[in-house]
From Swiss-Prot:
It comes from Brucella ovis (strain ATCC 25840 / 63/290 / NCTC 10512). It is an enzyme of class 6 (ligase). Keywords: ATP-binding, Ligase, Nucleotide-binding, Protein biosynthesis. The active site is at K79, S159, S183. Its EC number is 6.3.5.7. One of its GO terms (biological process) is translation. InterPro entries: Amidase, Amidase_CS, Amidase_dom, AS_sf, GatA. Heterotrimer of A, B and C subunits. GO terms for cellular component: glutamyl-tRNA(Gln) amidotransferase complex. Belongs to the amidase family. GatA subfamily. Allows the formation of correctly charged Gln-tRNA(Gln) through the transamidation of misacylated Glu-tRNA(Gln) in organisms which lack glutaminyl-tRNA synthetase. The reaction takes place in the presence of glutamine and ATP through an activated gamma-phospho-Glu-tRNA(Gln). This is Glutamyl-tRNA(Gln) amidotransferase subunit A.
Amino acid sequence: MSELTALTIAEARDKLKAKAITATELTDAYLSAIDAANDAINAYVAVTHDQARSMAKASDERIAKGEAGALEGIPLGVKDLFATKGVHTQACSHILDGFKPEYESTVTANLWADGAVMLGKLNMDEFAMGSSNETSYYGPVKNPWRAKGSNADLVPGGSSGGSAAAVAAHLCAGATATDTGGSIRQPAAFTGTVGIKPTYGRVSRWGTVAFASSLDQAGPIARDVRDAAILMKSMASLDLKDTTSVDLPVPDYEAALGRSVKGMKIGIPREYRVDGMPGEIEELWQKGIQYLKDAGAEIVDISLPHTKYALPAYYIVAPAEASSNLARYDGVRYGLRVPGKDIADMYEQTRAAGFGKEAKRRIMIGTYVLSAGYYDAYYLRAQKVRTLIKKDFEDVFAKGVDAILTPATPSAAFGLADEVLANDPVKMYLNDIFTVTVNMAGLPGIAVPAGLNGQGLPLGLQLIGRPFEEETLFQAAHVIEQAAGRFTPAKWW
């Protein structure tokens, strides 16, 4: 069965088309793999065995009739904050206990319309707040990768840790994820997978549990660049139910792969050389520069002067929006309800019991920066900084730069239950240092595996593109992937 789960989406698509395998066989292979591995990895918080099998059966019938969709019979995992009709959707928070939506998110509806099969819902940091997938009410996810000669558990990154771990461990062919400050790209880098955060407005947010509405964007995590391109084509669409959705045709992203990068201008930002960055990250970056240079790209030094303000500004804007978005969870209509002596007490008891520590921390920060006395000093200034960050990128792109190459993360995956990080949230927030600028500016960014560190753990590079020019990112990421190769963890689970 493992030879079926080893297939990429592109390979499985070809075999299904040629009738060499059936969607039912492929789905059963994944369900068996999940049943065998999930206790160890904890990537799934709900597995939809019956639904997966009936969707696979319907796919086989469509294939037989010659009516196959673009993702016909491909088994996918869904991050737990996409609404899936009648299926567990809790953003891995206790406050949404027992919640099963009456409707389907636009992203998942697009995937099912193209014939994809749902295997279940994937673990994540609570309300997508975290960089290690340790804030989930359902417990942490374990990274399928381990350091050479070590049995120590590592984090898969966050918030889309379940998505990245499931893809890396071959517990789904691909997965949906979301990215507010790096939640697709950082876990992809930590697990040797490919993750793209599309331009803000490219993929509908309708039916996705909101964290920070002006930053959130859904995208895929996949095993390679081609699979990410295939998934993104199905996920992206115009959606009138999302006022930020953009009316632009969705290109065939897969067609961009293999196109030459000769003459493409790649910017290298000097501000991304941060103090204390491990030598192996710098080395990897140089390697990526060389790969693109060898393929004919022109490398230019650039400056993004406001980079150093991105992280503090992000941790004002994102919690501010979160405190507003999370105000709706009160125990009245759905989810957890803890009885109280009156309605105000019921609200308090429900929210106290329902939200985890990190969600509470961000709600408090957000409420503080939006309060009358501090709104101008913090929130307003952070929004001004955001405008300056966006302008930095606009200036660089105006000079003819096609894409920007940076590291994806400041380190490889770190240990589960790391005491230093547990006691110092700011240190944990530094994981997003290379990724938040992309969300602040609403740009597309892709993380692609580019090598292993000295301990045999995957490291990723990030490419940042012009708005709605994801094709350029796929094109350049494919060049890096071809040069660096693909990386799969040794099975221990």
